[in-house]
């Protein structure tokens, strides 16, 4: 079982709770992060969830590199718009060889065509999209039991 999971959120996800609530709901990123941390504590086996959010691609890449040094065993990532553009984030995930799940709050396949392409999906253990913020709960649960 994985003891340390890193939850990464990319650009504009810091606006959750206020950004387009008809699409993303009213749950804040802070609420999502706190729920993930509590979910790990409920395991009562010293599991932990670390959280990180950045609007900057390079900072996300640096955090993935740091995760390897910290002994993170699984990454749950909502790369936001970088999902559709970032070879750098893909390469960081592959370079560290940390297994990961890609999460999206909305069903990206029901949205604009440019959102249908993911640079991460083909390398992810799983992709969860369209389940709202519950997608994070499902991904964290899987990661903690990996």
Curated annotation (Swiss-Prot):
UniProt cross-references to InterPro entries, sorted A to Z: DHquinase_II, DHquinase_II_CS, DHquinase_II_sf
- Which stretches are transmembrane? none
Per its record, the protein catalyses: 3-dehydroquinate = 3-dehydroshikimate + H2O
The record's subunit annotation is: Homododecamer. Adopts a ring-like structure, composed of an arrangement of two hexameric rings stacked on top of one another.
Q: Which domain of life is it from?
A: Eukaryota
Q: In which pathway does it act?
A: Aromatic compound metabolism; 3,4-dihydroxybenzoate biosynthesis; 3,4-dihydroxybenzoate from 3-dehydroquinate: step 1/2
Presence of the UniProt keyword Hydrolase in the record: no
Question: What keywords sit in the KW lines?
Answer: Lyase, Quinate metabolism
The cross-references to Gene3D superfamilies, in alphabetical order and at most eight, read: Dehydroquinase, class II
Protein name per UniProt: Catabolic 3-dehydroquinase
A UniProt-annotated Pfam family: DHquinase_II
Q: Which GO terms describe its biological process?
A: 3,4-dihydroxybenzoate biosynthetic process; quinate catabolic process
Task: Show the GO MF annotations.
Answer: 3-dehydroquinate dehydratase activity
Gene name, please? DQD1
Q: List the disulfide bonds.
A: none
Q: Per the record, where is site Transition state stabilizer? A: 19
């Amino acid at each position: 079982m994985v003891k340390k999971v890193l939850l990464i959120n990319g650009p504009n996800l810091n606006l959750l709770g206020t950004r387009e609530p008809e699409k993303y709901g009213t749950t804040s990123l802070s609420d999502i992060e706190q729920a993930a941390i509590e979910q790990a504590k409920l395991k009562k086996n010293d599991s932990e969830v670390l959280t990180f959010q950045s609007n900057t691609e390079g900072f996300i890449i640096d955090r993935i590199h740091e995760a390897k040094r910290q002994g993170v065993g699984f990454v749950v990532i909502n790369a936001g718009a970088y999902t559709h553009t970032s070879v750098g984030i893909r390469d960081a995930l592959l370079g560290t060889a940390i297994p990961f799940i890609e999460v999206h709050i909305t069903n990206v396949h029901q949205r604009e065509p440019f959102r249908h392409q993911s640079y991460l999906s083909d390398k992810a253990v799983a992709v969860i999209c369209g389940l709202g913020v519950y997608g994070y709960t499902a991904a964290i649960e899987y990661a903690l039991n990996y």
